[in-house]
Design a protein with these regions (language model features):
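Short, Lys/Arg-rich flexible segments
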Residues: 1-143
């Protein structure tokens, strides 16, 4: 099972593609760093902020779930499997951040009985962090 979250980054992609041609086609170094940013922010959402990438707080767990947890963890944290499964992969042309847990799609998208609790995606802070990273990286190429 795989979850895909897409964003229109066409302006950034066009600039990166032009630059990529000058760099023999590989953007793996900055894409690996972007993956690290996204992995960290995704983990922070699960472990700390309990918010979607757009900043909206997740719904509380149901009373039945709270009782079943018996004080263990919080929203999306019971044994830590989802949190531990967040990874990223970078190549010369792309970066993927996500979870290999089969149930992650139900958490991200919700079900008839479970509210959505989006954890994958880019927040406004992620965009800013990526912009800062790319500015620094490009400046390093010029200097």
């Amino acid at each position: 099972m795989r979850i895909t979250v897409s964003h229109d980054l066409s302006r950034i992609a066009q600039s990166l593609n032009r630059l990529s041609g000058r760099l023999n086609g590989s953007l793996e170094e900055p894409l690996r760093a972007i993956g690290g940013i996204l992995e960290s922010s995704t983990r922070r959402r699960i472990a700390e902020t309990k918010t979607a990438p757009d900043g909206k707080r997740w719904a509380d767990v149901s009373p039945a779930t709270a009782q079943a947890k018996n004080g263990r963890g919080g929203i999306l944290v019971d044994h830590g499997n989802l949190l531990a499964s967040i990874t990223h992969e970078a190549s010369a042309k792309s970066v993927i951040t996500g979870s290999v847990m089969g149930y992650s799609v139900y958490v991200q998208e919700g079900t008839k009985t479970m509210p959505t609790r989006p954890f994958l995606g880019l927040s406004s802070q992620d965009y800013q962090d990526i912009d800062d990273l790319m500015s620094d990286w490009l400046e390093g190429l010029i200097v």
